């Protein structure tokens, strides 16, 4: 989801940081963001309307809080590590900094460079991010994936329930008015790891699901890359 109208979500994250994170004894706090295209910075050439939500965060903070966005298009938790991107981030983390972690969209891809399994390898990568952040004195925050814009007919609700168990780019029924997601258990791994390790978890999927469902099939297109 490439959102360019992120205000409800960003206000929630801003409130979280301002009320639970601020340290008066530090000159500034850095929020490092790691994830995929839904979070990543975008080129603005040619009037491109696409924005990742991490790109929009700096405008919601004072100069005491800096956002360093390392999210990249097409990356999974696995490829983010193997490409050396995580090493670049963790080498900069200081005591009191935050690391926002959001993967899942691309972990379900079938190619070996990106694929991980929820409950095993995906969870292990999330644990690594958490453990190494804490080892540097940083504070990890886990997010699950932004909802995909998949609307179906009300009569296909049972298909939606089945799709929740089998993530992937399966064939979808005819578009209707009911939103459902196809991330499957990849939505649960960040929640489970957060509970296991005592990490703050933000249910990004629920937040965006409620937003998109509330807007409906037509108005929700304004949040995605439906360019006419």
Feature annotation, model-predicted:
Residues 6-28:
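Bacterial Sec-dependent signal peptides at the C-terminal "C-region" and cleavage site
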Residues 39-40, 74-76, 148:
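Short histidine/acidic/glycine/proline-rich micro-motifs that form metal-
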Residues 2-5, 26, 84-228:
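Alpha-helical cap/lid subdomain in secreted, periplasmic
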């Amino acid at each position: 989801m490439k959102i360019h109208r992120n205000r409800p979500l960003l206000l929630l994250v801003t409130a979280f940081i301002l009320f639970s994170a601020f340290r008066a004894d530090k000159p500034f706090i850095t929020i490092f963001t790691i994830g995929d295209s839904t979070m990543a910075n975008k080129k603005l050439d040619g009037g491109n309307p696409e924005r990742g939500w991490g790109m929009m965060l700096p405008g919601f903070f004072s100069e005491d809080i800096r956002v360093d966005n390392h999210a990249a298009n097409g990356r999974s938790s696995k490829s983010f590590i193997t490409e050396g991107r995580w090493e670049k981030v963790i080498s900069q983390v200081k005591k009191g900094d935050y690391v926002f972690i959001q993967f899942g969209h691309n972990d379900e891809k079938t190619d070996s460079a990106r694929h991980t399994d929820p409950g095993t390898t995906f969870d292990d990568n999330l644990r690594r991010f958490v453990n190494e952040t804490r080892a540097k004195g940083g504070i990890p925050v886990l997010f699950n994936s932004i909802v995909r814009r998949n609307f179906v007919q009300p009569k296909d609700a049972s298909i939606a329930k089945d799709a929740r168990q089998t993530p992937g780019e399966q064939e979808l029924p005819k578009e209707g008015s009911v939103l459902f997601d196809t991330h499957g258990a990849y939505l649960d791994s960040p929640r489970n790891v957060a509970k296991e390790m005592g990490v703050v978890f933000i249910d990004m999927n629920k937040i965006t699901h409620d937003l998109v469902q509330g807007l409906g099939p037509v108005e929700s297109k304004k949040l995605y890359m439906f360019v006419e």
